[in-house]
């Protein structure tokens, strides 16, 4: 939930425009009319919908995927894999696509990256930003689309988590601790988004590769010592 708040704070302008355009789109459907060209905010809504579709393929195996988090060898290898993707990201030719020119296939491929990122140890933002760069997105748009694409995913994950918590029985004494966690996640998430925007301008996503490699190797070493 904290991550969702951070995205809303960082991209409120885009979210507001999409909400407005969503209702305008309903009105256009009622009148059987389509504006030409399609407004950027409306195209962005459609791109996000297409990018979210691959997640539905993961739902039937959600428990199995989550179970991989207990295998630290898998998590370590996934971190190293993420590092290689980020390293390659800076070496891809800079794209120019934004919501005005990105295709449905582009969005679908980024969505596949997001589905792969449900695997423990694979960074969701790292995977989707890298996928965006690979399909030719302008770097700042790759970051923006990555986080806007996270809204349906994070919202769905929170709904499932709340459902599980209700079934397990929520302890009232734990609510304040949960709220503190949400606040910390919101602040941290917002700062991370600002940092990624800065890195997008500088074109240095590969700097995160070394962090992922170090974390991955450390995970494998510590697991091997046990």
Residue ranges of predicted features:
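Multi-pass membrane proteins that catalyze or facilitate reactions on polyprenyl-/lipid-phosphate substrates
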Residues: 1-226
């Amino acid at each position: 939930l904290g991550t969702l708040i951070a995205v809303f704070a960082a991209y409120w302008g885009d979210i507001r425009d999409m909400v407005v355009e969503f209702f305008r789109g309903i009105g256009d459907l009622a009148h059987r009319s389509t504006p030409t060209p399609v407004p950027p905010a409306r195209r962005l809504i459609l791109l996000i919908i297409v990018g979210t579709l691959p997640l539905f393929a993961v739902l039937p195996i959600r428990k199995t995927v989550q179970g991989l988090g207990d295998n630290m060898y898998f998590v370590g290898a996934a971190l190293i894999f993420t590092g290689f993707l980020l390293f390659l990201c800076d070496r891809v030719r800079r794209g120019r696509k934004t919501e005005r020119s990105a295709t449905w296939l582009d969005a679908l491929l980024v969505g596949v990256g997001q589905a792969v990122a449900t695997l423990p140890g694979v960074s969701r933002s790292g995977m989707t930003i890298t996928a965006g760069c690979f399909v030719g997105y302008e770097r700042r748009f790759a970051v923006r689309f990555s986080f806007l694409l996270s809204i349906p995913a994070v919202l769905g994950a929170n709904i499932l988590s709340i459902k599980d918590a209700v079934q397990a029985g929520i302890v009232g004494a734990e609510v304040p601790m949960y709220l503190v966690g949400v606040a910390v996640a919101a602040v941290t998430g917002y700062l991370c988004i600002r940092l990624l925007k800065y890195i997008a301008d500088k074109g240095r996503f590969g700097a995160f590769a070394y962090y992922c490699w170090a974390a991955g190797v450390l995970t494998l070493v510590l697991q091997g010592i046990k």
